[in-house]
UniProtKB/Swiss-Prot annotation:
Its main location: plastid. The gene is rps14. Keywords: Chloroplast, Plastid, Ribonucleoprotein, Ribosomal protein, RNA-binding, rRNA-binding. Binds 16S rRNA, required for the assembly of 30S particles. The keyword Ribonucleoprotein applies. GO terms for biological process: translation. It is found in: Plastid, Chloroplast. InterPro entries: Ribosomal_uS14, Ribosomal_uS14_bac/plastid, Ribosomal_uS14_CS. GO terms for molecular function: rRNA binding; structural constituent of ribosome. HAMAP family: Ribosomal_uS14_1 (MF_00537). This is Small ribosomal subunit protein uS14c. Part of the 30S ribosomal subunit. It comes from Helianthus annuus (Common sunflower). GO terms for cellular component: chloroplast; ribonucleoprotein complex; ribosome. Belongs to the universal ribosomal protein uS14 family. The lineage of its organism: Eukaryota, Viridiplantae, Streptophyta, Embryophyta, Tracheophyta.
C-alpha cells in the first residue's frame, strides 16, 4: 500500500495538470504558427512559467486498490500483483490464469 501522502500528491498534480492544460496547449500551437526565432523564445518562456507539477509527464498511473505506481496494467487500472490475485479469485470475467 502506498503512503497516503504520495497518493494525495499525485491527485494534486492531476488537478494542476487540468488547470494549466489549455495554457500549455495554446502556447504550443502558437510556437508552431510563429516563424521568427525571437518570438518563439518568448513563447517558450511563457511555456516554462506554469508550475513544474502541472506538466503531464510528471503524472504516474497508480493502482486503484493499492496506489502502487509501478507495474500497472492500463486495461484494468490495477498493479500486477493485485491483478493476479483478482484473476485467481475469479473476480475478473474473461481473464484466465496462465499455466505451463
Amino acid at each position: 500500500m502506498a503512503k497516503k501522502s504520495l497518493i494525495q500528491r499525485e491527485k494534486k498534480r492531476q488537478k494542476l495538470e487540468q488547470k494549466y492544460h489549455l495554457i500549455r496547449r495554446s502556447s504550443k500551437e502558437e510556437i508552431s504558427k510563429v516563424r521568427s526565432l525571437s518570438d518563439k523564445w518568448e513563447i517558450y518562456g511563457k511555456l516554462q512559467s506554469p508550475p513544474r507539477n502541472s506538466a503531464p509527464t510528471r503524472l504516474h498511473r497508480r493502482c486503484f486498490s493499492t496506489g502502487r505506481p509501478r507495474a500497472n496494467y492500463r486495461d484494468f487500472g490495477l498493479s500486477g500483483h493485485i491483478l493476479r490475485e483478482m484473476v485467481h479469485a475469479c473476480l475478473l470475467p474473461g481473464a484466465t490464469r496462465s499455466s505451463w
